[in-house]
Amino acid sequence: PSQSSAASDVYKRQIEYIGVGKVNAVFNALNAIKKHSPKQIINFGTAGSLDAKIKGLVEVSTFFQRDMDASPLGFKVGQTPFEEDIEITFGREGVTCGTGDMFVTTTPTLKTDIVDMEAFAIAKVCKLKNIDFRCFKFISDNADSEAKNDWVDNVSLGAKLFIEKIGSLKD
């Protein structure tokens, strides 16, 4: 939150803290939309990489809900029952992200480039509300047995990169 205030002051963008997990992400994204009526939402957060070549600050192009599993009912892993699409995209280049409400320390069933706990939820809100969405994730760990320690060691490193990225984005 202190870095959020610095970025708000310098780049004249409204920055909201949305919390951890899909429920917090949806609730706080909807509150921010109601309060500010944005044309675009930009999400920044940490993610674990399932590909050792993916490091640093990356932009996400495609979003999946990795912990949605109604496969016993005949649906694909990641597919919400009675909805056709299992992915959300906004037409940008980038990596794939699987969102779920668990911190990943082993390879999940639905394989994506990176994993997080909020992006799909915000992307879905934006898609349903017809709001453009961009998402940048700082790779804090490799979503493996060392993920907890790596995340603790690396989480603060992404803040500076995000502030730099915000400054480089066009309105």
Located regions from the model:
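Single conserved hydrophobic/aromatic residue that forms the stacking wall/gate
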Residues: 1-11
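Glycine-rich phosphate- or other oxyanion-binding loops that anchor nucleotides, phosphorylated ligands
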Residues: 12-171
